[in-house]
From Swiss-Prot:
Keyword Mitochondrion: yes
Alphabetical UniProt keywords: Mitochondrion, mRNA processing, mRNA splicing
Protein name as it appears in the record: Cytochrome B pre-mRNA-processing protein 2
Intracellular or extracellular location(s): Mitochondrion
Highest rank taxon of the organism: Eukaryota
Gene name, Swiss-Prot/TrEMBL: CBP2
Native source organism of the sequence: Saccharomyces paradoxus (Yeast)
Record keyword Mitochondrion present: yes
Main location: mitochondrion
Molecular function per GO: RNA binding
Biological process per Gene Ontology, one example term: mRNA processing
GO cellular component assignments: mitochondrion
Amino acid sequence: MVNWQTLFMVSLRRQGSSSRYRYKFNMENITHQVFPRCKQAFKKANLSYEYCDLEGKLYNASLMDLQKMLLRDINAPRDHVFKIVRTDLVEKSSKKRIQHWEQIAPIFDHPLSLYENLLSEMDNDFKPSFEWQQLIEVRSRDDQLKLQRVVWPKSIFSNFCRGIGVKKNTYDRLLKQNNGEVPMFVNPANAKPLPLFQVGDDATIGEFDGIGIFPYFVVKHRAFFVTEVDKLKTKIISPLCNLNERKRTDKANAGRLLENEKGEPFYVDAKGAASRAADGNAVTLKQLLERSVSHKTLWSKQTNKDRTCPGDILRATILSNDFSIRQLRTEFCKNFILYNIFTILQRNKKSIRDFSNDNNVPSFRFNWNVWDSYIWKQYQEAESMTLPADQASLINYKTKYDSFLQDLQTYSTLVISEMKWNQFSIFQNNETSLSRFEHITLILQTILTKSKMIRIFQPNLYKFMQDDLRATLMELTGFTESINATIGPGFANEQSLQSANALKKLANQLLHFEQKIYAEKFRVNRPIQLRPLTLSTNFKIVILDKQNAIPEIFQTLLKFTTQITTYFVKDLSEVELHGHMHCIDKKMLDKSTFMYLYELKYNEDLKAVPPQKEKIVDNIIGLLSNDEEH
């Protein structure tokens, strides 16, 4: 399990010293770039619209409904713009400006219209989406029988109903109450008769009394109609409800419903929603925005005029399918990490040659290190994934993105280490060769400005990075075209992959020990304070490499990864430890590689006896590390 707060601290300790490159000083501007982009987009003639129908205000929309909109946002053509269509009862005289548009527009990748449409303003080609959204009460013709909680779609679809489905026990009860005759219920919208059908236990009724039968939209419901005439009736397109019909359906409303990822309804009552919100989970966009206010110190300064949670963080939280404030904190950490990776390039622009006026761009050779090849392989795998079209594929896609971002964070940390190690030679180039940093730039720049995954989960930061890095060496050298031929032969074998994985594991464990030493607290109510780097002088890291398998280049690179003095040994007896150095943590990385963290302690009292489980683990690691290799 990735600890994103640990990775956040790693990134925070390595951020640029100038406020010009700091996250908080730039995030408001990055988010606000949405507004001129939207304004410019809606000035164009012959716009192609993505119409999203909604029962109610977008600000009050359920996060599950918003997630469905964002899935459309992910898959819509790039030149399309989004517009909300209200299918609930809205007075024509009411303002059609979207409430809190400035907070909502940055959540979308595509431009979102400032104004919403009413259903009555749409032409006949517009078809609202069919979704289970409410519970209603239906009564029998004689008003003697009633079903209080019947699963029902949006009110505008009421005319499409062809019956009421109930489970066997409810069917038998109604039959008994109606003197053995099958009762006939009435559609609240149009007073038309609705026959009663018995549905199986697998029907999506759950704890409710029944469900409306809508065979035009639900294929399973067509099984209730067996005669040829009845089958034809299921294909008849009924008119959408008019204003009076919708009012009558809304009068029969008995509660709100949401759909899960399978299109099945589940009940959301006010009390349950309030309880979930109290536990840190939001149900609506309004709740998520309101609860995020307590975390504004993470992404903004007191002097910022707009301290709203950045749209990228809100978007990633909604797409994660975990609507808790804990998840919002996690998505903030990822947004911060990605921004700091970008600043590696931003801070070193002067070290990159400008070929914009050179008609004879030289053809460069690319020399790949293992860590370059590894991140490029992960990037290729991520880019090869199909865009998510539903919630199940979205969850898999998000998991892959998180894994890739963790690898990208590790790569950026190794790049910073390499820059410290070769602080002069890394920038040296000539007419036929790229500098090492130019090569790194090409890799990072390609990923940051071309990645589909980054655009999907961090669209505002993605566009900002594209704009900032627009004049690129990458396009001129044909880097993306020649890169696969260059990387293939050197990284196709299993040994190279194992070597890269070993380096990644070593680097990540070093960073874990680093965080254990500094142990800064992740605060949301006031700015996070970093502890002084000099704190590390009381610590040492020892890496026991029993088979002497770690290449020297890896050893040097890892020594520059952290401020903590790091030793590589084949036997623990090779390490000269001060008399007061005590092992405070150890980790087995594989059967022949172990990592130890030592701390200098004076006048240490007798240690408390460790828990039995921890003691067993320590003993096993100790035995393995002392074994002789045969």
